[in-house]
């Protein structure tokens, strides 16, 4: 009903979608829950139709710096903390995407100082351009293999968060992630070991463990 109000001429299809609908379509914004193996999307790819995420559409319209967070675990917590940190620093921010408010719904709110996006591997895979100010990759474990088929495909989607980043935060304890990390951007690492240089880690001082930098 809301869509009909916004665009009365839009055609709405409910249930199974016939491949005949593909005629005349140049782009599909697909739900992240639908895999590329779905017959409709598979047919779209076969016909050379671009399939993108809502995030791709969002970044084309957003006019404030973006901070993107991904990882198998902890991304919702970190996204929420970053939002609270902005508030404590006197900066306005809006958090969403894979957490809470859908990314496109953030665009109808007042422009913030920062957008903080939690991104899933599904969203990252279908997002070609991701010009973020800071990209954060927390960790990667075998997950969502029903969607990505292999762990390497899953990792490839996660690593895409760095593709257009100005700066990045990454887990140096993941050797594969370190190997795929771009060397031409500013970076900050973290880990459970002692920090060495520009990063955070844990130091043991006479039995007391401290979070330490440098």
What kind of feature is each model-predicted range?
Residues 14-16, 52-54, 189-193:
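Short beta-strand elements of ligand-binding domains
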Residues 1-8, 102-105:
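N-terminal beta-loop-helix "entrance" segment that forms/cooperates
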Residues 19-24, 32-172, 176-186, 201-204:
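Phosphate-binding loop of NTP-binding sites
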Residues 6-9, 199, 203:
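Conserved catalytic and cofactor-binding micro-motifs
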Residues 107-108, 193-195, 213:
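Active-site loops of AMP-binding adenylate-forming
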Residues 5-23:
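Glycine-rich, highly charged phosphate/nucleotide-binding loops
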Residues 200-202, 206-214:
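Short polybasic amphipathic segments
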């Amino acid at each position: 009903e809301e869509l009909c109000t916004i665009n009365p001429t839009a055609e709405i299809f409910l249930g199974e979608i016939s491949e005949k609908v593909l005629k005349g379509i140049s782009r599909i914004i697909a739900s992240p829950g639908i895999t590329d193996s779905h017959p409709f999307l598979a047919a779209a790819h076969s016909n050379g139709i671009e399939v993108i995420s809502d995030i791709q559409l969002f970044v084309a319209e957003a006019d404030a710096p973006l901070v993107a967070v991904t990882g198998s675990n902890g991304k919702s917590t970190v996204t929420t903390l970053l939002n609270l940190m902005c508030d404590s620093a006197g900066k306005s921010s809006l958090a969403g995407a894979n957490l809470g408010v859908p990314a496109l719904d953030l665009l109808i709110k007042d422009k913030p100082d920062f957008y903080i996006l939690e991104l899933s591997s599904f969203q990252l895979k279908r997002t070609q351009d991701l010009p973020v100010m800071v990209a954060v990759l927390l960790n990667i474990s075998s997950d969502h293999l029903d969607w990505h088929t292999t762990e390497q495909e899953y990792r490839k989607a996660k690593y895409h968060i760095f593709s257009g980043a100005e700066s990045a935060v990454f887990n140096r304890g993941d050797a594969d992630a370190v190997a795929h990390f771009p060397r031409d951007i500013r970076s900050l690492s973290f880990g459970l070991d002692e920090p060495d240089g520009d990063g955070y880690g844990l130091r043991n001082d006479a039995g007391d463990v401290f979070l330490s930098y440098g």
